[in-house]
From Swiss-Prot:
GO terms for molecular function: electron transporter, transferring electrons within cytochrome b6/f complex of photosystem II activity. The lineage of its organism: Eukaryota, Viridiplantae, Streptophyta, Embryophyta, Tracheophyta. This is Cytochrome b6-f complex subunit 8. The chain crosses the membrane at residues 5-25. GO terms for biological process: cytochrome complex assembly; photosynthesis. Component of the cytochrome b6-f complex, which mediates electron transfer between photosystem II (PSII) and photosystem I (PSI), cyclic electron flow around PSI, and state transitions.
Length: 31
């Protein structure tokens, strides 16, 4: 159960990081 929570937290963190990174790149490239 603990591993599931940790892996889920990591997955959520990666999703947020990837989303924010792509958003920054998209915004800087000239919307």
């Amino acid at each position: 159960m603990h591993m599931d929570i940790v892996s889920l937290a990591w997955a959520a963190l990666m999703v947020v990081f990837t989303f924010s990174l792509s958003l920054v790149v998209w915004g800087r490239s000239g919307l």
